[in-house]
Amino acid sequence: MMIYSITPPHRLRGIIDLPGDKSISHRAILLNAVAAGSAEITNFLTGADCLSTIACVQALGVHIERQGTTVRVDGAGLRGLREPVDVLDCGNSGTTLRLLAGMIAGQEGMFAVLTGDSSLRSRPQQRIVAPLRALGASLDGRQQGNCAPLAVRGAHLHGGAYELPIASAQVKSALLLAALFGDAPLTLTGRTDGRDHTERMLAAMGVEITVNTPVIRLTPPAHSDALRPLSLRAPGDPSSAAFWWVAAAIHPDAELTTTGVCLNPTRTGALDALRAMGAQIEVTNQRIEGSEPVGDVTVRSSQLRGITIEGALIPRLIDELPVLALAAACAEGETIIRDAQELRVKETDRIATAASGLTALGATVEPTSDGMVISGGARLRGASLDSHGDHRLAMTWAIAGLVASGETTLRGAGAVDVSYPEFWGVLARVAER
């Protein structure tokens, strides 16, 4: 197990080129796999989760070549996937498992089993199994279909309407991928807020999809070769950038710039929260790349204040909440996080693990059923912490070590490889000692 020790640097300075966005990297592989033609994806995230997606798609007969962060996908068309000869191992990636389940569900006659590591096998899957079954899909798994391994038997899918009970981009995307193979349009209503990368990419690939929030309607393509391949450069991942934003805001002598960040409005919740907390943030060089808005974000040392994070903001920053909780511990006043019960079913129970780690650092934190209450202003002290195999926690505790007095020791530091393999190298470069 990788152990890493961190002590506070004198200052933080640097310009950081971010790894490609994790959500977009996943979707670029999956959607181009069923396109008619070849696509090139640059700045692809080479973290373990996205590599799991590549491996699973290759097992479905799709030819993929990767050189560093450049990936070429030769699409097989909507009906050209091949039945896998072995179990599809999704590793730690919920996105891989859930979106693939939607895609395979519409491959009539195909049989596949989707599984993953112990963490993924414990995460709830009924959230995709139930709506996919409503479209005519055949899925089953442990605990009445709630846990992987999931067995998926491709079937004739129907259109119709479905109301999403939770704001989950993975659930929404699984249904939209399944709808590509349906016999009639699919209309989604309810909690369709959250990341909209799938909708943007499908539209760019020629799929008839309309979004009139909260209503999304997708009409299945008439032909198996109807999807145009979509070459793109994955913009910088705002969920990874958020660690540097918080680091700069809470360190007493810091200025960090993250370049080429995805500024999709469904992904900028962390920026909005930090602005509300009083962070000094400057966004420059805003532009459109492909179907996504991007820009450069500079954050400087700031005096933060406590806020309430709740409601519609939560889906826009769900992955950034652990590091925002750290920012709250360094702020003046009380921060309340609520409506974030989804944190309970991430790679770890992030409410429990984040609260425990912050408490070990000297913060005053009260976990609740759907969030936590953080009393800011405490002087953090170094501690021995554990990532519990969770990449977001590993990076959160690393950032804490930049401001906590003494030495912070992190067990399971290698978990960062899931989404940000270069993290430790960047940290060493920007921390001036």
UniProtKB/Swiss-Prot annotation:
Keyword Manganese: no
Enzyme Commission numbers on file: 2.5.1.19
Key word Amino-acid biosynthesis present: yes
Swiss-Prot/TrEMBL GO biological process terms: amino acid biosynthetic process; aromatic amino acid family biosynthetic process; chorismate biosynthetic process
Catalytic reaction(s) noted: 3-phosphoshikimate + phosphoenolpyruvate = 5-O-(1-carboxyvinyl)-3-phosphoshikimate + phosphate
Subcellular compartments: Cytoplasm
Molecular function, one GO term: 3-phosphoshikimate 1-carboxyvinyltransferase activity
Active site: residue positions: D319
Alphabetized CDD domains for the sequence: EPSP_synthase (cd01556)
InterPro entries (UniProt xref): Enolpyruvate_Tfrase_dom, Enolpyruvate_Tfrase_sf, EPSP_synthase, EPSP_synthase_CS, RNA3'P_cycl/enolpyr_Trfase_a/b
Keywords: Amino-acid biosynthesis, Aromatic amino acid biosynthesis, Cytoplasm, Transferase
EC class name: transferase
Residues annotated for phosphoenolpyruvate binding in this entry: K22, G94, R123, Q170, R350, R392
Pathways involved: Metabolic intermediate biosynthesis; chorismate biosynthesis; chorismate from D-erythrose 4-phosphate and phosphoenolpyruvate: step 6/7
Pfam families: EPSP_synthase
One Gene Ontology cellular component: cytoplasm
Domain of life: Bacteria
Cross-referenced Gene3D superfamilies: Enolpyruvate transferase domain (3.65.10.10)
Binding site for 3-phosphoshikimate: K22, S23, R27, S168, Q170, D319, K346
Family: Belongs to the EPSP synthase family.
PANTHER family: AROM/DEHYDROQUINATE SYNTHASE, PENTAFUNCTIONAL AROM POLYPEPTIDE
Role this protein plays: Catalyzes the transfer of the enolpyruvyl moiety of phosphoenolpyruvate (PEP) to the 5-hydroxyl of shikimate-3-phosphate (S3P) to produce enolpyruvyl shikimate-3-phosphate and inorganic phosphate.
Subunit relationships: Monomer.
Protein name: 3-phosphoshikimate 1-carboxyvinyltransferase
Taxonomic source organism: Roseiflexus sp. (strain RS-1)
Source taxonomy: Bacteria, Bacillati, Chloroflexota, Chloroflexia, Chloroflexales
